[in-house]
From Swiss-Prot:
Cofactor(s) of this protein: Fe cation
Protein name: S-ribosylhomocysteine lyase
GO molecular function: iron ion binding; S-ribosylhomocysteine lyase activity
Species for this entry: Clostridium acetobutylicum (strain ATCC 824 / DSM 792 / JCM 1419 / IAM 19013 / LMG 5710 / NBRC 13948 / NRRL B-527 / VKM B-1787 / 2291 / W)
Described purpose of this protein according to its UniProt entry: Involved in the synthesis of autoinducer 2 (AI-2) which is secreted by bacteria and is used to communicate both the cell density and the metabolic potential of the environment. The regulation of gene expression in response to changes in cell density is called quorum sensing. Catalyzes the transformation of S-ribosylhomocysteine (RHC) to homocysteine (HC) and 4,5-dihydroxy-2,3-pentadione (DPD).
Subunit structure: Homodimer.
Top EC category: lyase
Length: 158
């Protein structure tokens, strides 16, 4: 079997950033998948499931309620390796195109207080596995990167 595209990225040199993972075409519709890499793979500790789960709930809620991107959001969810998230949008985008959106979203995550949306037994199959303070921490940390993001953090390393 051939490796899938995401397994051909050199995870030994990959740093936190926002990368176009792939673009798929369905008829005339382009779908862009983004690799939102929050930690340095195999270098930094991965995020724990509780904060990943919380970021997923907050990020998905933010995106599905966004004035511009709500109807373009196909999916937002964690990578199995717990080093980041995938964001799938309808449209042909570059990493630069979505930096403003991600700045808004991660500020929302960093500043969020109160009940995590969907964190109830009726709404979620693992609602007790949440950690809002750590989600706030990761939101602040990634916001700092987004505020000063450089080109090398917007394109996969060779």
């Amino acid at each position: 079997m051939e490796k899938i595209a995401s397994f051909t990225v050199n995870h030994l040199t990959l740093q936190p950033g926002v990368y176009v993972s792939r673009k798929d075409k369905f008829g005339d519709v382009v779908i862009t998948t983004f690799d939102i890499r929050m930690t340095s793979p195999n270098e930094e500790p991965v995020m724990n499931t509780a904060e990943v789960h919380t970021i997923e709930h907050l990020g998905a809620t933010f995106l599905r309620n966004h004035g511009t991107y709500a109807e373009k959001t196909v999916y937002f969810g964690p990578m199995g390796c717990r080093t980041g998230f995938y964001l799938i949008l309808q449209g042909d985008y570059t990493s630069n195109d979505i930096v403003p959106l991600l700045r808004e979203m991660y500020k929302f995550i960093a500043d969020f207080k109160g009940e995590v949306p969907g964190a109830a037994a009726r709404d979620c199959g693992n609602y007790l596995d949440m950690n809002l303070p750590m989600a706030n921490y990761w939101g602040k940390k990634f916001s700092a990167l987004l505020d000063n993001i450089s080109e090398d953090r917007l394109n996969y390393p060779e």
